Amino acid sequence: MAITKTVRMICSNIDGNNNKFWNADLHDDGNVFVLYGRVGYAGQSEGPFTGGQSFLDKKIKEKKKKGYIEFDGIAVESSKTTVSVISDVREVAKKQIQFSSPQLEKLIERLAASNIHNITSSTKITYDVNTGLFSTPLGIVTPASIDEARNLLALIKAQKENGKDEHFGPAINRYLMLIPHDFGMTKVQHFVDSMDFMQELNTLDSLEASYTSFTTSVKENRTEKSIEEQIFNVKLDTLDNGHPDFKEIDKWFENSKKKAHGYDNVRIKNAYVVDIKDNSDMFEKSGKVLGNLTRVFHGTSEANLLSILKSGMKVSPPSTAYIAGKMFGNGVYGAVQSSKALGYTFGRWGGSTAASGWLFICNFAMGKMYNPTRSGSPPSGYDSTWARAGDCNLFHDELIVYSNHQIHITHLLECK
């Protein structure tokens, strides 16, 4: 007995305190099986119901009248269709990232596990270690739904900051349909009031980093997988603490610290040489020629490392810049003080609160630099911004580039 059609519906409604799902599977014998309940709970099963497609159409119509919508941001496995799925990010990373020692293999496993934990601990998205699938009660989240969720998050944040809580009902309803959360039996409004926008953004970034697609075809009860897409084209090597490059980096790390940041006791625990092929090639071809190469630190959370190793640093969508509160527009930010960058990885300015902090060392191709005296994006004709301490009410320099090809990642530092 095979499933010929799957329907996933959800009703998240801030006014009615609804956070419910309704799933139905139509089998080839005409029977329909239903699973329904509150997001975060196992749900109740019903069926089989007879009547086939006509019964299913009738129930869908009834549910829509009650505020349910069909969820279109998923990919659902089917015995008769070709689908995109999420492969096991841990196995893909270990297989494709080129590394030179068992220490690095353990690091890759750790970063993949952190990526998974960041998703599953803050949402109702689950991970199946056997299949490598991340799924919601409605199915598998796709990149398109992640993009939509980012835009909705920016809208919700803007409306909250403008004191227009009464207007963001449709946006929060849609967001919770795309990225289901379990907040128990408490009111949806309580979730909204305590919403951590940076945590939500980090979750979306982690989910996007974990999405690797390959085609699955099912023929006569036999699964054939196409050649797996090359996701990680990157080399990692350890940098021994006796190496001249390590000593030079460590000196810069220590001498650039500012006492005001409170990281005097943080040291470099491990250093790694990073070569992301696409990132290096793009920088050599289009970025380096801009000139004014400047070395910077870039702090990030452990959960985001896998994403950066996969694709390099990317200028985020405008909605992300707004959510993160970036002063000088939508770009990638770097610091010439290690302690400034450490604030982003140890949680002071919106990063994680993990035991280890993580800094990338990058070369920024600054090109024609804009030195602002107030917040905002640079005027047309500039390649970058260097906001200097003392200007714009800043205590420390911030460097911003606005195109991916202006960034070249060279090292990764673990700090404790």
Regions found by a protein language model. Name each.
Residues A42, D57-K65, T223, E228-Q230, ...:
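Segments that shape or occlude catalytic/ligand-binding pockets
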Residues E46-Q53, A335:
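Conserved aromatic
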